[in-house]
């Protein structure tokens, strides 16, 4: 809840301070910021996987992913978050509007359609949001988000760290969630 409040306050403050961006600038900024987040988080998780395996990566995520996301937001002057319908951390649960987009993208995948690289949406309140799909495209992702044996040390660590976890059972090419960048 605290993270949502901080996201909302930062979002409103950024709207009041910044000059309006053009659509092209929003696309460019959204692409840059989301790519930076994916790279920073991915590099950290890769290091954790190499040095301590999936459990180390899980602990890194639980302790650092939100603050790393906040750091990227602060550095970029945007509001950014990662969301999913099948979230691991309840803080990353998609809103009603975000679920609608994720469900639309799920339907596209089910019909063998290609997902857009991004979606730029103007909300009813006049604000614009950049959405970027997160697709499982690396075997390493499946170590923590694939089919996890119920009695494995990793499954136990996930359950201890995230009692409400819903983020397993994915396959290569599945939609994991999306990155949301607000302007």
Question: Which residues make up each language-model segment?
Answer:
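Extracytoplasmic c-type cytochrome modules immediately beyond a signal peptide or single-pass transmembrane anchor
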Residues: 18-140, 149-183
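Short Cys/His-rich local motifs and their 1-3 flanking residues in nucleic-acid-associated proteins
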Residues: 146
């Amino acid at each position: 809840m605290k993270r949502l409040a901080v996201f909302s306050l930062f979002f409103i403050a950024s709207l009041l301070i910044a000059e309006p961006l053009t659509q092209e600038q929003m696309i460019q900024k959204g692409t840059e910021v989301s790519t930076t987040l994916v790279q920073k988080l991915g590099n950290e998780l890769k290091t954790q996987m190499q040095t301590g395996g999936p459990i180390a990566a899980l602990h890194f995520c639980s302790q650092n992913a939100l603050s790393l996301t906040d750091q990227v937001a602060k550095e970029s002057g945007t509001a950014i978050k990662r969301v999913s319908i099948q979230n691991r951390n309840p803080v990353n649960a998609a809103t009603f509007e975000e679920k609608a987009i994720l469900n639309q993208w799920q339907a596209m995948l089910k019909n063998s359609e290609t997902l857009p690289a991004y979606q730029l949406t103007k909300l009813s309140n006049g604000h614009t949001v950049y959405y970027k799909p997160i697709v499982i495209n690396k075997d390493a992702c499946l170590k923590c988000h694939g089919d996890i044996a119920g009695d494995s040390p990793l499954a136990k660590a996930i359950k201890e760290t995230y009692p409400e976890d819903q983020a397993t059972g994915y396959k290569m090419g599945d939609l994991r969630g999306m990155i949301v960048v607000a302007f």
